[in-house]
Amino acid sequence: MKLLFNLEYQTTFGEELMLNILTHGVGAESPSASANNVEGPKQSNGDVVARHKMSTADGLHWSCQLTIAEKDCSCIDYYYTLVRGDQELRHEWLVAPHRLELAANKGARYTIYDHWNDIPEDSYMYSSAFTECVAARRCNQSVATDYDRTVRIKVRASQLRSNERLAMLGSTEALGCWEALGARTMTEHSCNEWVISLNADVLPDTFEFKFVVLDEENDVTPVWENGMNRTICLPPMEKGEVVVYELPQAWFPVYPWKGAGTVIPVFSLRSEGSFGVGDFGDLKLMIDWCDKTRQRILQVLPINDTTNTHTWQDSYPYNAISIYALHPQFCDFRQMPAIKDEAIRNHYEQLRLELNALPQIDYERVYDAKMGYLRQLFQQEWGSVSRRESYKLFFEQNKEWLLPYAAFSYYRDLYGTAVFGEWPEEATLAAATEHPSAKAKKEMQFWYFVQYYLDMQMHDAHNYARQHRVILKGDIPIGISRDGVEAWVEPKYFNLNGQAGAPPDPLPLEMNACLPGCVWNATPRSLSPLERNIGFWTQA
């Protein structure tokens, strides 16, 4: 099977275009382009990029022909880059690469006409807040066709809601002769990109058409796209030929999406079933309220662990000791196994009722009570939890931050302070993780146990929000705690002698957050999650 990619892009002397094929998964084969095949980089998600040089006769019209085995793959994702020698000058928007589906059963030669895709003005519509929540729709592969000659039309349309779909209406009988009832429904084969296959044998050489939006739930008049009719002039086509047109984005006369929402700290969501403080179970109740009041955004204040002094001062949510770990106070005991010992269970139930009846949250009593409950559960459940496949997967995926966090928490409680500069020299990460004492190992396992349940409950609340089409929006501090895990493990990235905050504004107020600043000229070497994050922000 032959694939001929075409792109119009004006270049200057010395510049070249490259076609970059993404091969998903280990061992995937890349299409062959003989001597023009160049080894490319590996993406952060594990995809391998195979680069192919394109050719041109005028510096404007670029093309590249590839050959693949007919059963090698069902679709190809790719993007274009502009290079000068070994230097990459720019590349397309990588969030939504081009997708070519090999959906024509009789297709032996594909001719693809693309256009360069920069970051669109509505790029936010490609975020998970829309594609997986507010405007979530199921993407599907195109149905295979048996046409002798096939025309495939692709277009991006990001304004559609979850109950809407894209269709084509045109001047030919195959496209409904401009009658709404004859509109041809398209397939969303990737987020916000729609495609349709047409039988070229029943199409005239030139035809006009427009894209329309259909409502799947209500029988209403289709919404027609803005602008003049689109026109396609088909080239001569032989049997087995497929021509693919990627068209400019479709825009419709609809208002931009707007959503109302609420900002709230999770600890304030105390309900009748709480344990003296709002938790991740109560977060679901708040999501229900947002949905019933037609709010689409729920922003929560930071939910990271702030346990520093074991006093009420730890209630400040913007001084987290870890940028990853969640606060133990948000554990919902209703979603965890019950304590089997009846006397202990009744004790904590009475304590729960007492703490829940307080007019204000007693941070210290609630924290101590919930930690005592969690330690009882740990003694009871750790043996079975540690053997679960879900726990093993959680630990493997998060051990880069989980081990330092557990070690830090162990030392903090052992020495009675989170100021790691006051710990003895032997209190190192290596000592706690490589050759721990029995006590240290048990204590660190407790923190693994707590974070495992917190992770499950937070994921459950997040999925619940998506099911109700409520965007669960987070909040983060402006920096790390000077007495936290990151400062302890990787101090080279932080100015621990400085303090960051907010400068005065027109109201001549300022705020000293007492957080250390970042050392931005430290070279990230991708040796840890924090270093990768710094690399991302400095390169963004």
Q: Where are the regions that the model predicts?
A:
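Acidic/aromatic-lined carbohydrate-recognition and catalytic surfaces
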Residues: P253-P491, L527-L530
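Aromatic-rich carbohydrate-binding modules that target alpha-glucans
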Residues: Q10-S74, V83-N105, A157-P204, L214-M237, ...
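Structured loops at beta-to-helix junctions and adjacent beta-edge loops in soluble globular domains
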Residues: E8, L22, R156, S171, ...
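A short, amphipathic beta-strand motif
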Residues: K2-E8, T150-R156
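Non-catalytic scaffold segments within catalytic domains of secreted glycoside hydrolases
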Residues: E443, I476-G479, D483-Q539
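Extended acidic/polar, glycine-enriched regions
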Residues: N226-V254, G281-D282, I297, T306
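Compositionally biased low-complexity segments at domain edges in trafficked proteins
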Residues: G107-R149, S158-R161, E238-R270
